[in-house]
């Protein structure tokens, strides 16, 4: 534990670089990047429930894409549900980095494991999604059970930086899609269908929000580079 306290800044940046590299590796990288997909789709699902709508199905796919099929009355509710995914991912990344900064590493595992369990039990419908959520939950429960401080910190930081980086990357991808293929720009297209506001406008707003939250995360919760010099 003393080693972790004195070296967590270095370990954080090692994990940040590892996450950026590892998540680009086929299969294994996509497996870990699915944690951000889980959070994104959970955002749609939870907002649906908050608005008294119905979550019909959540699907997670091996290519890190996902879908959430919902029922909701009124265009305002439908717009809020379509809007939820990217902001929830960005805010979850912020929350995880805040908890990491405060030393509440176990809380990160508890939160992500709880989200996976709830979605798996109530809404997941496809085989890959069930496989991924099941193995993700088992991995985290083993980490929690053995409670090895360095491994707890390593995985908590790893998940945090994956959600943080993938929230940014996916928002950039959404913006590019809204420019090149506005009819296939995911949530931005869905928002256009409900509000008639062009998909690119929604993509810009979502990207701006994600970058703002990410900037707050960096300036407040990233370990100071000066401590490494």
Regions found by a protein language model. Give the residues of each.
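Small-residue-rich helix-interface/hinge motifs
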Residues: 23-78
């Amino acid at each position: 534990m003393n080693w972790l306290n004195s070296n967590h800044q270095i370990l954080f940046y090692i994990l940040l670089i590892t996450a950026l590299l590892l998540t680009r590796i086929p299969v294994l990288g996509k497996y870990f990047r699915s944690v951000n997909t889980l959070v994104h789709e959970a955002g749609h699902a939870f907002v649906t429930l908050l608005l008294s709508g119905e979550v019909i199905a959540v699907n997670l796919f091996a290519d890190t894409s996902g879908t959430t099929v919902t029922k909701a009355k009124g265009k305002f509710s439908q717009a809020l549900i379509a809007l939820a995914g990217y902001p929830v991912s960005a805010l979850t990344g912020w929350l995880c980095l805040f908890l990491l900064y405060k030393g509440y590493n176990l809380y990160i595992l508890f939160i992500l494991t709880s989200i996976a369990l709830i979605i798996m039990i109530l809404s997941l419908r496809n085989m890959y999604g069930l496989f991924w959520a099941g193995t993700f939950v088992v991995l985290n429960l083993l980490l929690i059970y053995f409670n090895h401080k360095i491994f707890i910190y390593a995985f908590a930081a790893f998940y945090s930086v994956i959600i943080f980086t993938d929230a940014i990357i996916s928002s950039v991808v959404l913006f590019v899609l809204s420019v090149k293929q506005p009819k296939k720009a995911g949530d931005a297209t869905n928002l256009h269908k409900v509000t008639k506001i062009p998909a690119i406008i929604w993509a810009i707003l979502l990207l701006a929000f994600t970058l703002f939250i990410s900037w707050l995360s960096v300036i407040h919760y990233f370990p100071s580079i000066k401590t490494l010099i």
